[in-house]
């Protein structure tokens, strides 16, 4: 986060793009593809596709069934299109962001935490006015066995829960903004990821503590049409959150969600 904030301060040009140190661009033409679309549609935020990889072998494209966003959709309708097609996800590096949005420090990343992209993407969604998406694979997202997304500790899960609480507080502080409703499915997905991670915490007392706090936000599951989240909602109604955690643990300790940035 500190490196990103430093880069934001040093950035020039009209748009800002992030790339994590262990990821890489798909090919040498990706910036041309981004630039061409930005010149055509002039959005505040352009989202793009990415490919998962272990560094050697491609593991599949993230958005497999959605083509590029049709040109001509009104700015006020663009975020609804993005959310209805499950294209708004918690990562900074699959987006090109108009640099003007970073003025006054409104889009600084919170430092010294994990999962910092979650609340940042929510704040970005509330701040930007127009959105676009291209189906081109721009980034190769590398998943290592030692990466944060492949390991679970109590502190990391607690930070994920704190991020969800932060997002809920942000939405509670927004008045008369229809985008709040559009962002509830986004929080629902983070909540589903939280449940999967809680199931992987080995210490039962720590798991119980996390689940006790997580119960306050279980109603967000009702806002998502994502198949995984709908299954969690059904399970929570049938066997409660504690039973849902047990089911996730049985299903390879929550691997249903491992690396699932969609």
Residues covered by each model-derived region:
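Short aromatic/hydrophobic "clamp" motif used to bind/position activated sugar donors
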Residues: 16
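Amphipathic alpha-helical repeat scaffolds of TPR domains
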Residues: 184-196
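A structural signal for short, well-ordered beta-strand segments and their strand-loop junctions
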Residues: 47, 133-134, 181-182
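Membrane-interface aromatic/basic loop that binds lipid-linked glycans or pyrophosphate carriers
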Residues: 40, 200-262
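Donor-binding/catalytic cores of nucleotide-activated saccharide
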Residues: 3, 21-131, 141-155, 175
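All-alpha amphipathic helical-bundle segments outside canonical DNA-binding/catalytic cores
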Residues: 177-185
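Catalytic core of nucleotide-sugar-dependent glycosyltransferases
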Residues: 136-144, 150-178, 193-197, 201-221
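Glycine-rich, basic loop-to-helix element that forms the pyrophosphate-binding segment
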Residues: 1-11
């Amino acid at each position: 986060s500190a490196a990103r904030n430093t880069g934001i301060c040093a950035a020039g040009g009209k748009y800002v793009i992030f790339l994590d140190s262990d990821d890489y661009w798909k090919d040498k033409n990706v910036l041309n593809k981004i630039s061409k679309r930005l010149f055509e549609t002039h959005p505040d935020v352009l989202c793009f596709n990415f490919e998962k990889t272990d560094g050697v072998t491609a593991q599949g494209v993230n958005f497999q069934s959605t083509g590029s966003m049709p040109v001509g959709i009104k700015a006020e309708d663009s975020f609804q299109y993005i959310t209805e097609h499950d294209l708004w996800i918690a990562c900074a590096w699959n987006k090109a962001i108009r640099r003007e949005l970073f003025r006054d420090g409104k889009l600084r990343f919170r430092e010294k935490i994990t999962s910092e992209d979650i609340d940042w993407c929510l704040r970005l969604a509330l701040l930007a006015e127009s959105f676009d998406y291209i189906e081109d694979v721009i980034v190769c997202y590398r998943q290592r066995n030692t990466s944060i997304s492949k390991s679970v500790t109590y502190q990391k899960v607690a930070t994920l829960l704190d991020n969800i609480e932060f997002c809920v507080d942000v939405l509670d502080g927004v008045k008369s903004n229809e985008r709040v409703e559009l962002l509830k499915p986004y929080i629902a997905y983070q909540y589903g990821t939280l449940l999967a991670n809680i199931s992987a915490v080995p210490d039962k007392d720590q798991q119980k503590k996390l689940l006790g706090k997580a119960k306050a936000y279980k109603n967000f599951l009702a806002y998502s049409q994502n198949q995984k989240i709908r299954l969690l909602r059904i399970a929570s109604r049938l066997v409660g959150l504690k039973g849902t955690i047990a089911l996730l643990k049985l299903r390879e300790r929550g691997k249903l969600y491992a690396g699932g940035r969609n």
